[in-house]
A protein has these predicted regions:
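Bacterial N-terminal signal peptides
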Residues: 11-22
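Bacterial N-terminal signal peptides that target proteins for export
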Residues: 1-13
């Protein structure tokens, strides 16, 4: 996902050459998109970042929305240091007088049971706003029961669990869930109902090492029994594949730029061997390497310059050449793993939607086109502070945003032509509205919740399917509203009647089944 500012910055950075590769977009037809019949068969979704506050609780275990912190004797909190964790991410030691603490997801009026292995010496407590909640410790067992009710999906305070760490037998395998939930269930049923029906799930936001641009290897990766899914490489591949299988969707993964070849190969083998028959996997290298706001683009540029790659398009061109080179390397590994099963693999190269020039450069570099199956961009219809200034809500909903839909999909058609030139599919790794106002958050909320957003999404999906006709992974499943509001729903389980974007998507699913 690119912010409005970063898109403008990059368009300026790449220079006029990128815009000369295609004719100027027309905004004609800004009001005729509603005439296109939408279909949901191509519509996927991006999952949102794992945290306790965005309105999405994917996992039954309530601990997996946060990371460990320590609390000193004065009550001050700080992040737990890596040296204080064991190899699986459980707190193994803290200074004297400190406690380990972990924020839990809030639940709506439920009894919760926490179970664990190890010795907490009777110190395990649940607190909300520094006050202990009513709780019961089961005699002779590592089990604590408490009751909690979240007033609303975005209404803190959230519960936290605290305990003393015994280095000789520290707490591990901590599991907190509703008392009536089965111990082995992985995913929250409300989350499953919210994500059900999408054809593709793009997991980039769950793969922590992608946007963090950190080095990962297979031996140091997270596993389902790890104590934290926010660090290292993020949510374990086992859980992402399990989710795709459970809801009947094709997974879309991003390989971290700094993952070694062994990690990439083992990841690919796990997917090959465990993804349900009939399902396909989409794979790309990192996320938005074209975007100068991200560390991965700057690394690609440094590497491209250091390798002495073609500099006829400047250092940015060297970054894109390095991206093409890296894409060939990673896709070569996946292709080898899926030898004989290539129909289950979709290899993706991504580019900026408004720059067909660079899409062409990437595909034409070396034999990159032969190493991929699809070109992807993110056809957002964006509105920033400058576009919104002085305009009424009616102006924005009735004129500005419909024109933006037409403009971005005109660019998408140019990208489709580039892909077709090389015999490749054209798809979208992200998409949807991209309203980002730094100075008028109340207006953002009005726009996102306006009933006319339903018609805009219906129009957008309809024209995408009419003019493009391939996969789009909308951004994103859930999320609250601030300077932006990308969530199709503000929280998992939000009634569709209150979520105009999701209502349009759900209706497209229903129409595709007719």
């Amino acid at each position: 996902m690119a912010s409005t500012a970063s898109i403008r910055l990059l368009t300026s950075f790449v220079g006029a050459a990128s815009l000369l590769g295609s004719a100027t977009c027309s905004s004609s037809g800004a009001h005729d998109v509603a005439n296109a019949a939408p279909t949901g068969k191509n519509i996927g979704v991006n999952v949102s970042t794992i945290n306790t506050w965005d309105g999405s609780r994917p996992f039954m275990n309530l601990i997996y929305g946060s990371s460990w912190q320590s609390r000193d004797p004065s009550g001050a909190g700080r992040d737990v240091e890596v040296s204080q964790l064991d190899s699986a991410g459980w707190v193994k030691s803290l200074p004297a007088g400190y406690q380990a603490t972990r924020t839990l997801y809030g639940v709506a009026d439920a009894d919760v049971i926490c179970r664990w292995q190890g010795n907490d010496h009777g110190s395990m407590r649940v607190v909300v706003n520094e006050s202990e909640v009513r709780q019961t410790r089961m005699r002779g067992a590592n089990e604590l029961r408490f009751r909690y009710s979240l007033r609303s999906p975005h209404d803190p305070p959230l519960p936290s669990i605290r305990y003393t760490v015994d280095p000789a037998d520290y707490v591990r395998n901590l599991d907190c869930r509703e008392a009536d939930a089965k111990p082995g269930v992985l995913f929250d049923p409300t989350f499953l109902r919210t994500i059900d029906g999408f054809s593709v799930i793009r997991f980039m936001k769950w793969q922590a090492a992608v946007e963090a641009n950190t080095a990962v290897n297979w031996a140091g990766r997270n596993t389902p029994s790890s104590g934290d899914y926010l660090g290292k490489d993020g949510v374990p591949v086992e859980l992402m594949v399990s989710l795709a299988n459970e809801v009947g969707a094709d997974p879309w993964f991003a390989m971290p730029w700094n993952a070694d070849d062994d990690y990439v190969a083992r990841f690919a083998r796990y997917v090959r061997d465990n993804l349900a028959p009939g399902r396909r996997v989409y794979v790309e290298v990192s996320n938005e390497v074209w975007n100068g706001s991200y560390a991965v683009m700057r690394q690609a540029q440094r590497e491209g310059v250091a390798e002495g790659l073609d500099n006829s398009d400047g250092e940015y061109g060297q970054a894109m050449a390095r991206y093409a080179e890296k894409t060939r390397q990673v896709m070569g590994i996946w292709s080898k793993v899926f030898d004989g099963q290539s129909d289950r693999l979709v290899r993706v190269a991504s580019a900026q939607n408004v720059s067909p020039f660079w899409s062409e450069r990437i595909l034409a570099h070396g034999d990159t086109a032969a190493s991929i199956d699809a070109l992807a961009t993110a056809p957002y219809w964006e509105l920033g502070d400058d576009e919104a200034r002085g305009k009424s809500l009616d102006d924005i909903m009735s004129h500005s945003l419909p024109a933006k839909i037409a403009e971005t999909l005109d660019w998408a058609k140019k990208q489709k032509a580039v892909a077709a030139k090389y015999g490749k599919r054209y798809i979208a790794y992200e998409g949807g509205q991209h309203v980002w106002l730094n100075n008028n958050q109340p207006l953002v909320a009005q726009i996102e919740r306006d009933p006319r957003m339903y018609n805009l999404y219906k129009s957008y999906i309809g024209r995408w399917n009419r003019d493009i006709g391939d996969t789009m992974a909308l951004f994103a499943l859930t999320g609250g509203i601030g300077k932006a509001g990308f969530g199709l729903v503000e929280y998992a389980g939000q009634p569709v009647s209150e979520a105009p974007k999701m209502r349009a998507v759900r209706e497209s699913f229903a129409q595709s089944r007719r």
